[in-house]
Amino acid sequence: MQTDAPGDIPAPTPSPDHRAARPARSRRTTRPGGGPSLLAPGAARDPYRLYRVLREEHPLSYDAPLGAWLISRYDDVVTALTGPEFTGFPHDGAPRGGPAPLGLCHGSTGCLPRDRYTVVTGFVPRRLAERVERTAYVLARRIAGRRQADLVEEFCHWLPAGTGPFRSPLRTGDAAPADEGPCTRHTGLRETALASFLANLLDDPDLLAALRVEPTLAGRAWTESMRRDPPVQVVLRRTLTEVTLSGGTLPARAPVACLIGSAVRDPERFAAPDVFDPFRRDQADATTGPAGCPAVVLGRLEAEQGLRALLDAMPRLRWADGFRPAATGLLTRGPRSLLVRPG
């Protein structure tokens, strides 16, 4: 496993680790540039052990097989996603301060406020909301009479696909809709996020019972699922200038892999980060994507309406006998199958 810095990119300058004094963070340090590779065997099957090693021992390291610097701590990742010293990768012409492809957002500039107008945050056209609800109930009722079903194949795939196009109005009153972009055309991330959301809830029968009584809790459960199990695990960025992070200083024009899946499990930011807890006080707000992105808005709506339809059609919904969900993937991650007993 290659651990040296590449010949054409200078090694980072070590900087004091301001986290080292905290008990939760290991005091061990290694030479910047050394560390395990994101492409190591087994990383896609269980990346969280690798993430922990990177956060504690190699917060800034160059991954030669990947060809990028790895950053894994929450504060560092948020800096790379939002700071003006970073831009999109590999397109250096991406707008500064533009949204990174994060959460359910593909990074479309249409997801940002503009000088002429502002996208209505959290707004869903009434007809679209009705179509999401109708599609969710049709799919749920098709599954309800079966002895066993796969929610990924028979529900999570079809609900986002059946939602149709999203055209957001403009807050200024301009009648022209916002342009469609990749966030509205592509549904794969919403499918993956919905599958992780349902897996987290089915793993907790008590929480599922609480949601039957109080459906409004679904919003908090969705936010927590997006934190604990984000569909996009790695986002690539590029530095515009030298940038100092907790593990050292990155050179200008350096490719950087932001390990979202590691950042959202950082114990310096989240208490008991591996636990799915919709009632936590420290819910994530910086790694879910722009609030005005249509994919972000639709994903939440599909999760809330989809869960309600499933519970209405199948009050005794539970895992199939002997089944345990398993997430897979490195760049994007989620369960590929959710076998359930509808009744």
Regions found by a protein language model. Name each.
Residues M1-G343:
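Cytochrome P450
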